[in-house]
């Protein structure tokens, strides 16, 4: 087993889209990801990694997807397939259980929560790049 040491000065853990719709049984997207998540031990690994990162005083950054609201995509001419599906399913709908952060994997006091992203990239149209650079995170 290889041991890697990470410095809290330049390392952050990014947790992407930790919503109930994605990470909880009964969530709108959960069944689509369940098989792969279970095959790789995703949830068990997250349950080990997040507390270890917090104990090492490494910054946690939450990278949330946009929470669906009525009319969000009205008039859009160039929605990608993911946005079309998200709009139809109302994934991560604001004000619903599915749009709430998962109780185990969501933010805690001291975490940084970046602006919500609208598609597959946590960088496009958010402040993630700026947050990482301003805080000196390179890993």
Annotated model-derived regions:
Residues 91-139:
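Internal catalytic-core helix/loop-beta-alpha segment
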Residues 1-108:
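Active-site acidic carboxylates
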């Amino acid at each position: 087993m290889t041991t890697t040491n990470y410095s809290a000065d330049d390392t952050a853990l990014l947790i992407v889209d930790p919503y109930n719709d994605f990470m909880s049984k009964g969530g709108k997207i959960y069944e689509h990801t369940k098989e792969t998540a279970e095959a790789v031990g995703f949830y068990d690994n997250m349950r080990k990694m997040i507390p270890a990162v917090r104990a090492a005083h490494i910054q946690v950054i939450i990278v949330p997807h946009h929470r669906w609201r009525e009319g969000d995509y009205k008039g859009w001419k160039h929605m990608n397939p993911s946005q079309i599906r998200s709009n139809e399913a109302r994934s991560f709908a604001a004000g619903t259980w599915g749009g709430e952060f998962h109780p185990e994997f969501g933010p805690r006091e001291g975490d940084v929560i970046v602006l919500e992203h609208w598609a597959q990239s946590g960088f496009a149209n958010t402040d993630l790049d700026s947050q990482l650079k301003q805080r000196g995170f390179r890993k």
